[in-house]
Each structure stands twice: as structure tokens, then as C-alpha cells.
């Protein structure tokens, strides 16, 4: 049996007409609802294009807006991160908890404060694992981590230790800055590796990040860092209004020094007046249900107060 079906275009037009009629009827003639004024216009919410600054810097190094493509590339990242609302809002919430941990380490190691935003573009300040296997706030690969003092075993993975991984990231960035002479190139190397930056600089015959033709991810990397920095420095200009009580607060913890093996971390947590969920949340670097402690060694574990 054949039936006549209206064309898809007609269905869409008809649906829009009905939807428009419902909207108009609710705002124009609803005498039983005094909260809706007769003749009240429909207000369409429009997104506002974020303003690209006329000048900017990364860690004190000026951004060369006169260079080819620089302004437009920064504009793209500002648009993406301004209107990536849920993720950017979570960045603000998590930063309230973790920047007080990260900032003093950067200062101690002599890194510019701008590099705290690197942890946001790497992981969103979450203990995530990339498809390539990079892990933690600072996204160290398993093979690279030990080179920067991070222990990785079946029971312990210090890529997830925020304090230790931050120190390791600082060491990497300082090495890269020493080699390339630029914080922008140091940041780029954090994404693609020192060898990759070294190769591209040599092959292309340029000497700055802003002139390099890079893979799509690294080409956006420093611009994304700059965009996040701009949004964090003036959130209301980008449409973010964050109440203090909506931010995540730093964890209140006490340190327990463990000098003997723990056969059952669940039982250990209960003995300390907590539970495994709290233990693993505060110590995500504990990757097993037990913990081996060598003779004469001691390991610091954070527990809720």
C-alpha cells in the first residue's frame, strides 16, 4: 500500500510555524497569566564574540600579533573556550582547589605563574589518561615519568601525585626553556616533545613558535594556553560569573606516614576513620589494593581530617 508522505522541507516549515505560534501566543495573549505581559517581545539570546586583546604576553614574552595568522589563531581559541561553557566552568571550580597547590611550586622552581594554565589545557585539572597513555594533571608518559623522578609501579604511579608531578613538569619546562630560549617553544615541546620542536625549527629555518608550521594539536596549544589565561584573568568579560560558594575548596587533610606494608588499603582507611573512596580520592597515585613499603622507607598518605 502506498501512502503520500509530505516532503521533509514541509515538515520542518510546519514544525517551525507551530513552534513560533506557541511562542507568540504565550507572550502576546495570555490573560490568565499576569506574569506574561501582553505584547511582550520575544528576546533572542545572542552569543557575543570575545574580544582579542590588542597586546598580550606568555610568561612575559610578547605575543607578536603582527605575525601572519597569530591574531586569528588566538581568536579561534578564545571563541572555543568561551563557549565551551560546561568544561570552562569546571576549570574555574577545580582551579580554586588546585592552583593553591600548583602556584607555590612554580614560584619555588622559578617558573612564570602563567604555566599553571598548562595543567588546565593538559588535563582540565583532572586525573585523566590520554589515548596515548599520558596520565595525571601534567600528562606524563609512563616511559618519560622516571626521567623526572616520578615512580611508576603496579602499586604506585606518581604521575597522579599532584605535588610530585608538578615538580616534574617544572623540571621539564626549565630544561626546554634552557634549550630553546623561549617559553612559548618550551610549552610547545611539552605537547610534541623536544625532538619534534628541534626538528621543525631546523627544517623550516625559523626560530619562534609563532612562525612554525606545526601539527594541528601543537599549532593550537600555546594559543589555547593564552585563551585560558585571558578568560581566567577577566572571567566576567567572557560571560562567566562564579560565586565563591560554587568553587571547589582545597581538601582539608592530615598526613599519615606509613613505614610498614599495608596488605589491605580498605582496612587501613577504615582504621584511620575514613574509607577507600576518600583514600583514593586524596591519593590517586595509589593504584592497587595494597602498598609495599621497603624496610627503612616511609610513605606519606593524605587522609581527611
Explain the meaning of each model-derived region:
Residues 133-153, 166-169, 173, 197-200:
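Substrate-binding/active-site groove segments that recognize
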Residues 111-126, 186-192, 279-282:
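Short, functionally critical alpha-helical segments immediately adjacent to catalytic or ligand/cofactor-binding
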Residues 173-200:
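Catalytic and binding regions of secreted/periplasmic enzymes and modules that target cell-wall glycans
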Residues 282-305:
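Extracellular LysM carbohydrate-binding repeats and other cell-envelope/extracellular binding modules
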Residues 190, 265-271, 278-280:
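Short alpha-helical segments in extracytoplasmic peptidoglycan/chitin-binding modules
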Residues 2-110:
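An acidic, Gly/Ser/Thr/Pro-rich helix-cap/linker signature
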Residues 84, 88-99, 108-111, 130-138, ...:
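Solvent-exposed, acidic/flexible segments
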Residues 243-273:
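Primarily a LysM-type cell-wall glycan-binding module
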Amino acid at each position: 500500500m502506498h501512502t503520500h508522505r509530505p516532503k521533509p522541507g514541509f515538515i520542518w516549515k510546519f514544525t517551525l510555524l507551530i513552534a513560533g505560534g506557541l511562542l507568540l501566543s504565550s507572550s502576546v495573549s495570555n490573560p490568565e497569566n499576569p506574569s506574561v505581559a501582553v505584547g511582550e517581545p520575544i528576546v533572542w539570546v545572542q552569543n557575543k564574540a570575545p574580544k582579542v586583546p590588542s597586546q598580550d604576553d606568555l610568561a612575559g614574552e610578547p605575543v607578536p600579533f603582527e605575525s601572519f595568522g597569530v591574531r586569528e589563531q588566538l581568536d579561534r581559541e578564545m571563541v572555543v573556550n568561551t563557549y565551551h561553557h560546561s568544561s570552562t566552568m569546571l576549570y574555574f571550580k577545580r582551579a580554586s582547589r588546585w592552583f593553591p597547590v600548583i602556584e607555590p611550586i612554580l614560584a619555588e622552581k622559578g617558573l612564570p605563574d602563567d604555566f599553571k594554565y598548562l595543567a588546565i589545557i593538559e588535563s582540565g585539572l583532572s586525573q585523566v589518561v590520554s589515548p596515548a597513555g599520558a596520565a595525571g594533571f601534567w600528562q606524563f608518559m609512563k616511559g618519560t615519568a622516571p626521567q623526572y623522578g616520578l615512580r611508576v609501579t603496579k602499586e604506585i604511579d606518581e604521575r597522579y601525585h599532584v605535588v610530585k608531578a608538578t615538580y616534574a613538569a617544572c623540571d621539564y619546562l626549565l630544561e626546554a626553556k634552557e634549550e630553546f630560549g623561549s617559553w612559548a617553544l618550551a610549552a610547545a615541546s611539552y605537547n610534541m616533545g623536544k625532538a619534534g620542536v628541534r626538528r621543525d625549527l631546523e627544517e623550516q629555518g625559523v626560530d619562534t613558535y609563532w612562525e612554525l608550521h606545526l601539527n594541528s594539536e601543537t599549532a593550537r596549544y600555546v594559543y589555547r594556553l593564552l585563551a585560558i589565561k585571558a578568560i581566567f584573568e577577566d572571567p566576567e568579560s567572557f560571560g562567566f560569573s562564579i560565586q565563591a560558594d560554587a568553587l571547589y575548596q582545597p581538601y582539608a587533610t592530615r598526613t599519615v606516614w606509613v613505614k610498614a606494608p599495608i596488605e589491605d588499603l580498605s582496612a587501613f582507611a577504615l582504621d584511620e576513620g575514613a574509607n577507600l573512596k576518600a583514600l583514593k580520592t586524596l591519593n590517586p597515585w595509589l593504584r592497587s589494593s595494597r602498598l609495599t613499603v621497603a624496610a627503612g622507607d616511609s610513605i606519606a598518605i593524605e587522609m581527611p581530617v
